[in-house]
A protein has these predicted regions:
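Non-globular targeting/processing and membrane-anchoring segments
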Residues: 1-4, 19, 33-36, 114-115, ...
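A generic secondary-structure signal
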Residues: 27-30, 79, 117
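Thiol-/selenol-based redox modules, centered on thioredoxin-like
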Residues: 85-86, 91-125
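Short active-site neighborhood of thiol/selenol oxidoreductases, capturing the structured segment around
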Residues: 1-24
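Structural motif
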Residues: 8-11, 43-46, 103
Length: 125
């Protein structure tokens, strides 16, 4: 079981999205030995024709890359406590619960500090 930090964005992944993918990679590296407990992903809301584009995986083999439809996107927000169209970072615990949200312009240091603290101090059974 692992923690998942994912970035939710509309496809295609443009400048801000690219910057935030780089930031997630840097956070993962900065976690050091605790990085084995964390994975990171890009979740893109895409039309089916966009699903074949998977260039991010080639640039970063550790990045998990998922595509969801508009319908899946709307369903996600209908059952979550987050605002519709909330592009940004989401932190999921090992039990599959979304516990934190960070806006797209969040500071990497804040995300790193929260994640580092959780990995160092919390265990789930």
């Amino acid at each position: 079981k692992y923690w998942l930090l994912f970035y939710l964005a509309r496809s295609p992944c443009r400048d801000l999205c690219q910057k935030n993918l780089h930031l997630m990679r840097q956070i993962h590296i900065a976690l050091g030995k605790n990085s084995a407990q964390e994975k990171y992903a890009l979740v893109q809301v895409a039309h089916s024709k966009d699903r074949i584009k998977n260039e991010h995986r080639q640039q970063d083999p550790h990045l998990l890359n998922y595509f969801i439809s508009d319908k899946e996107f709307h369903k996600f927000f209908s059952v979550s406590r987050f605002k519709q169209s909330a592009e940004g970072y989401y932190l999921v615990d090992p039990l599959g619960r979304i516990i934190l949200y960070y806006p797209p312009h969040a500071r990497g240091e804040a995300i790193y500090q929260d994640l580092s603290h959780l990995l160092a101090h919390l265990t789930t059974g």
